[in-house]
Amino acid sequence: MNEFPVRVLSVIAPMTQLNTPYPSTAYLTGFLRSRGVAAVQEDLALGVVLALFSREGLQRLCGEVERLPAAARTACTTAFAQRPERYAATIDAVIAFVQGRDSTLAHRIASRNWLPEGPRFDALDAYVDEDGGDPLGWAFGALGVQDRARHMATLYLNDIADVLRDAADPRFEFVRYAESLARSQPSFEPLAQALAAPCTLVDRTLQDLTQAALLKHQPTVVLLSVPFPGTVYAAFRIAQTIKTLRPDITTVLGGGFVNTELRDLSEPRVFDHFDFVTLDGGERPLLSLLEHLQGRRSVQRLVRTFLRQDGRVRYVHLAEPDVPFAEVGTPTWDGLPLDRYLSLLDMLNPMHRLWSDGRWNKLTVAHGCYWKKCSFCDVSLDYISRYDAATATTLVDRIEAIVAETGQTGFHLVDEAAPPKSLKALAAELLARRVGISWWGNIRFEKSFTPLLCQQLADSGCIAVSGGLEVASDRLLALMKKGVSVEQVARVTKAFADAGILVHAYLMYGFPTQTVQDTVDALETVRQLFAAGCIQSGFWHRFACTVHSPVGLDPQAYGVTLLPLPPVSFAKNDVDFVDPTGVDHDALGVGLKKALYNYMHGIGLEADVREWFDFPVPKARVPRQRIARALADG
């Protein structure tokens, strides 16, 4: 008999990722079941894509394209309109292929004689074979038919996504939906207007799927976890549909976006769609909320919960201990269609593909961050500041349970930065218990990762790591309290690479006081790290100052002045600032990203870094052998 006579449905709202479920519902469902609550889950993000990218979905899309006036036609919609029957004839087979259900189709896809090719395929013309042979041979060789076909299939699906965006809903992307309506949006008005507007093809599809989920699960409570701004609009559209069809169902909003951006929520209209909004770790607030719905706890005793009373937003927080990380239970993917996710190959880079290819079980080694000092990070918030680790025994118990349930042995450790001590213990436990898995995750490039430890991690199944090199400048790394140096990062990343572990570097530009010279020097350092085989992949992030970060809380310490925020009743996170250096970081970012894209394809590693910029920049001051010397001295 359940402790609570309620039925909780946790929903993944569009859009997150396509190759594997976003883990929030698996975590919540596993926890609630461990406490005796009837809990189920549904991935409407995947559902929307599978409905739209089907023969029936393309027939609907074709109608949208036909209704476009000639002046609104784009290269994408024109290419699609010229051969809709070829798209309709191939879409279901391509989806089956990227789901892993029809591997022999790879030969036909790779031939380039079967799929209709839209503008996305133009990128293949950039690859030139000097001998006039296969321009993609450098990436796939003679036998890489499956990967070649997966890349072609991804281009094909991206073409259709472009048509969907141009003809049916300009807000649609595979990994985000209507993001601008929520990100640091001080007023709820843009979102309210979008929710009141006529439904698009994507909206109608989402409404149909929501109705089907309600009929299937018959929930009394629906939890919508929104990790990113690009999931918020869809979550509100789902809640709107629920309140139209079943106003008796309690709707609850939570997740990473709420935790970072809605902490000062005062907009009553949010509660036209959601009965409650909870902050930070969801376990304790949900337990108190379920008790309240049972009549066993008064509203005054809720935990970290917003609600509307007498037309005004009220925040209620009875301080109670959070559920220890060791007691949150094992995530469960029960109820999610694990054989229906799409493994895609966008970037021809072995490390970068991990984010879009493969059905990875998500697992957290520890709650929060053990370092929690970085100046750009939201270190004042619970998801960073409350560090709570589980033992290696507990983690491997969870791993074994997840493998038994899913039949999948790949794990993505989704910590902000997994602690070296915990990873060492995890590796030892995996090896001692002879648990064979593949795993990868986020770390800090600190000196604790010795060559010996890196090899131990590889022996336990570690295939890749990602970590922050950020600005690649010792002065700026010290200013941001990163706790590493460039030379240290070089030695640690090389230790991982030498152990056969792929390395991805998170890179940053536009940090306070960063000059053009600093930026050019950083790119030269990154070039050397690629050339030395220390890193195989990277991504440049434009620094954004948030109100919860040390920079946002004490801007004078970083030499910048914050611009006043408008009145906020909805979302608050990013805050603009004035940096006296006056550098045009956006212009520099174009060159940085161009260089990195080429480095990840093994191109331009000997070129002067100034060649990547469209305007004059100073010569790099970094010695061309800086990284080589650091590795030799290590």
Task: Go through the PLM ranges and name each one.
Residues 2-13, 33-34, 52-173, 191, ...:
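Radical SAM enzyme core and accessory elements
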Residues 4, 191-194, 312-362:
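N-terminal [4Fe-4S]-dependent radical SAM core
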Residues 15-18, 23-57, 69, 89, ...:
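Glycine-rich beta-alpha loop elements in corrinoid/cobalamin-binding modules
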Residues 355-393:
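Canonical Radical SAM [4Fe-4S] cluster-binding loop centered on the CxxxCxxC motif
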